[in-house]
A protein has these predicted regions:
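Extracellular/virion structural assembly segments
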Residues: 56, 72-93
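Acidic-leaning, charged glycine-interspersed low-complexity segments
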Residues: 88-138
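Small/polar-rich, solvent-exposed N-terminal microdomains that initiate assembly or binding
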Residues: 1-57, 93-104
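Short, acidic Gly/Pro/Ser/Thr-rich loop/turn segments
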Residues: 52, 138-140
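Short, solvent-exposed beta-strand/turn "edge" segments of beta-rich domains on protein surfaces
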Residues: 54-60, 120-124
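Short, conserved turn/kink motifs that form compact alpha/beta structural patches or helix kinks used as
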Residues: 44, 60-61, 70-78, 108
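Oligomerization/assembly interface segments of phage tail-like spikes and tubes
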Residues: 59-73, 86, 127-137
Length: 140
């Protein structure tokens, strides 16, 4: 799993010119959770599930990975722009993974919401886009 999450992060940091994703979140991409007091906007990614699969002698992994985009902008323009850049970066993409071959990665679903977050400065309205991707890997 570590090889996959490392490759996922590396893909974001090496493809900044094409998608602009990392620039749009100020390079604030975190695995599993953001640090307390993280500046907006930011994105958190995590593996939701990792299911082993096989066909005869080939071994596969069916992974669901979730990206959560957070923006404190008053309107939804910023979070929508970040979402578009995330799709450009990861939907039907290709990248190298040590010990695995990426068969596919595509967007599964999008859930949009507006949350209220309590900060030392008070309550803040935050846009939260939760984007799920299906990933299929072959073990090598």
């Amino acid at each position: 799993m570590k090889n996959f999450t490392t490759a996922l992060y590396k893909h974001a940091t090496t493809d900044t010119i094409v998608s602009g994703f990392m620039t749009s979140i100020g390079s604030r991409l975190y695995e599993n959770e953001a640090p307390e007091g993280a500046e907006f906007p930011y994105c958190v990614y995590m593996v939701v599930s990792d299911v082993k699969d096989w066909q005869f002698v080939e071994r596969f992994r069916d992974i669901l990975v979730q990206f959560s985009i957070f923006s404190s902008a008053s309107g939804s323009t910023e979070v929508k722009g970040i979402y578009t850049k995330l799709l450009t970066l990861y939907d039907e993409c290709a990248f190298s993974i040590t010990s695995n071959t990426l068969i596919w990665m595509w967007r599964n679903s999008l859930t949009t919401m507006r949350d209220e977050v309590t900060t030392p400065a008070g309550t803040l309205g935050v846009w939260h886009y939760s984007v799920d991707f299906d990933v299929y890997l072959e073990d090598t």
